[in-house]
Amino acid sequence: MMDTTFFEALSDYEKSLSDDRLAQFKIQAAKDVLQRLAVHKLPKKQLPKLSFTEKQILKNPSLMPLDDLLSNFRQWLITQFGVWYLPNLKWLADLNHFIAGRRVLEIMAGNGLITYGLRALGNELVTATDAFQWQEQDIEIADPWTQIIPLDAEIALQNISYDVVIMSWAPDTAQTDVKILNYLRATHFTGDFILIGEPFKHTNSMAFWQTAQLTKVPELNANHHSFDTIDDRIFLVK
């Protein structure tokens, strides 16, 4: 059952800021995501930028507490739903088109929202794996949206067939991501390694960013834009 604390706070601001159209737009977008995630549905499109500019707050100081609340939206998604990366249906359609019928392996899939979305589009060649070792994370109990094989990423790479590898929001507290990249290089992987993360900041290890050769793909970023201060993007990695 969804903890409604955040949702109720948004509803309160929806009432108190009823005359501010921009606030209403952001509040309704955030509420829609919470309602959808609670019943295992993905947002139809990318969230708008949830923060307000300094100019907007100076014009209407009543926005400041709402801005503070919305700055914690991603953390709420993590602690309540186990969602670090939030895919949307438009982006998933782009991803599915890019994959073009190839075999997909999603590693460190978490609750499997990306795989769930691809399978909902009829993609039957996608496999999701996660070791589910979430101790000391902000959420420690998994709530998979789809079938996920409980496998360590390195073992999955060695035992499952794939043409495309997807890794999103790998933790910055371990160097598993470097081991994965080194394995793909050592085995001369010629497919696509799709990465979702923020270079040198909130995702992945520093060692990974220092060695990864990144290419930003316009097609995979067209319907993905950060909704907060974390500038995660979609890359191909070599």
Regions found by a protein language model. Name each.
Residues A93-R102, L157-N159:
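Glycine-rich helix-loop-beta junction characteristic of Rossmann-like nucleotide cofactor-binding loops
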Residues Y162-D177:
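A short SAM/SAH-binding and catalytic strip from SAM-dependent methyltransferases
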Residues A174-K238:
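C-terminal substrate-binding/active-site "lid" region of AdoMet-derived donor-dependent transferases
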Residues G101-G110:
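Conserved class I S-adenosyl-L-methionine
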Residues M1-F98, T129-S161, I230:
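S-adenosyl-L-methionine
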Residues R103, E124-L125, D192:
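Residues at the starts of beta-strands that form the adenosine-phosphate
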Residues N111-N123:
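Conserved SAM-binding loop of SAM-dependent methyltransferases across substrates and taxa
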